[in-house]
């Protein structure tokens, strides 16, 4: 049987507990899951690519069938082909996410008709978490421990403490 490889692309700036839950669930559905840390030209990143990769590696260390890579500046569909992934994993928090992901899935199909997008609904306890809101809360000194894994919380605190001095 062919190995079922899934790609979970995102900017992950920062990687949240919602992202982690999606990865954990995907790891039970697929033989291998590759987290692709992407550069989103529309966003101003807080963490650089290597830092995000290192943080995510720390967080997923106990997931044997999950790896993380920095995605080169290329289309996600092309990168999926390059790593042998036939599935894209996307987490859905609400109707707005669904609309957006449906359109992206259709566009990805124009690039690779064999690439399937698998949507995982966010669990209730993670449905309100967004990376941009986490960054804003952290930037103003708020508590993010319930929103991000411990290693990410520490990194956020370290990164943003200079702005509050």
From Swiss-Prot:
The record marks 19 as: Transition state stabilizer. It catalyses: (R)-4'-phosphopantetheine + ATP + H(+) = 3'-dephospho-CoA + diphosphate. It comes from the Bacteria. GO terms for cellular component: cytoplasm. ATP binds at residues 11-12, 19, 91-93, 101, 126-132. Keywords: ATP-binding, Coenzyme A biosynthesis, Cytoplasm, Magnesium, Nucleotide-binding, Nucleotidyltransferase, Transferase. One of its GO terms (biological process) is coenzyme A biosynthetic process. GO terms for molecular function: ATP binding; pantetheine-phosphate adenylyltransferase activity. Pathway: Cofactor biosynthesis; coenzyme A biosynthesis; CoA from (R)-pantothenate: step 4/5. Its main location: cytoplasm. The keyword Cell wall biogenesis/degradation does not apply. Its EC number is 2.7.7.3. CDD domains: PPAT. Coiled coil: none annotated. The keyword Cytoplasm applies. Its cofactor is Mg(2+). Pfam families: CTP_transf_like. It is found in: Cytoplasm. Substrate binds at residues 11, 43, 76, 90. InterPro entries: Cyt_trans-like, PPAT, Rossmann-like_a/b/a_fold. NCBIfam families: coaD_prev_kdtB, cyt_tran_rel. Belongs to the bacterial CoaD family. PANTHER family: PHOSPHOPANTETHEINE ADENYLYLTRANSFERASE. Homohexamer. Reversibly transfers an adenylyl group from ATP to 4'-phosphopantetheine, yielding dephospho-CoA (dPCoA) and pyrophosphate. This is Phosphopantetheine adenylyltransferase. It comes from Latilactobacillus sakei subsp. sakei (strain 23K). The gene is coaD.
